[in-house]
Amino acid sequence: MPVTLLGAAEIRALAADLDVTPTKKLGQNFVVDANTVRKIVHVAEVQPGDRVVEVGPGLGSLTLAILEAGASVTAVEIDHRLAERLPATAASHGVADGALTVVDADALRVTELPGDPAVLVANLPYNVSVPVLLHFLEHFPGLQRGVVMVQAEVGERLAAAPGSKTYGAPSVKAAWYGPWRLAGTVSRQVFWPVPNVDSVLVGFHRDAEPRGDEELRVRTFRIVDAAFQQRRKMLRQALSGVLGGTAAEASVVLERAGVAPTARGEELTVDDYVRIAQAAGVSAPA
């Protein structure tokens, strides 16, 4: 029996049955258009046999589209009512036993997942999208690629290049793991309720070799945070607190890393930040 997808009327009926109202607190907007969830799966290049993790499956519209493509899904859902109902929804839409695993938990607290997923596909709750992405990339090194739907502003930040207006700490931290790209736009009309912001698809591929170990990552991210907290200041001032305490000491470290002390944080690539962290030997925060 082929997997069938949810329609708009069925999604609303499911929500009513569960007494679920999409909430701004959880950043919920349910996708009610089958073509959109198929588009996400297509852009993510989901193949039969792929092990996919989905964060925030909600009522299951994207979940079913991933399963329709022949992948297995581990779905992480914070709302107990939704997590409890999802297996029954999948079973009634032709999903084979064992293809779906539901983890009833806060995605930001999950550090282990069954099935060693290699692909992340999700309509991420907008208020936690960047923290969730960085958490999963940090804790699940087996994740090799992914496509997620996020608020347009967030997607532009994740895929931003140095020197652009949207380039910031999330851009650099995301780039630590590999390249990111904007992969498409999504109409507001495919959501229930209709959001007051635009949405985009953003994709990533993890680099074959990590940039460094966990200690270097923590050091690098600490420097990135300091640089963008005072993004208009020259790095010798912005980084003085984490590179010795004075602008002069920071300048010595920056020059050792091959970075101009008069540069600003928004001009640097992730590789520049890694070199600064390596040159500094900054102690990781306790």
Language-model region placement:
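Catalytic cores of RNA-modifying enzymes
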Residues: M1-D225, E255, E266, R275-A286
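Active-site-proximal catalytic alpha-helix in oxidoreductases
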Residues: Q229
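Short helix-coil junctions and helix-kink-helix linkers
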Residues: S240-G245
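Short amphipathic alpha-helix in the helical subdomain of ABC transporter nucleotide-binding domains
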Residues: A247-A250
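Short helix/strand-capping connector loops at secondary-structure junctions
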Residues: V252-P261
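P-loop NTP-binding site
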Residues: D272
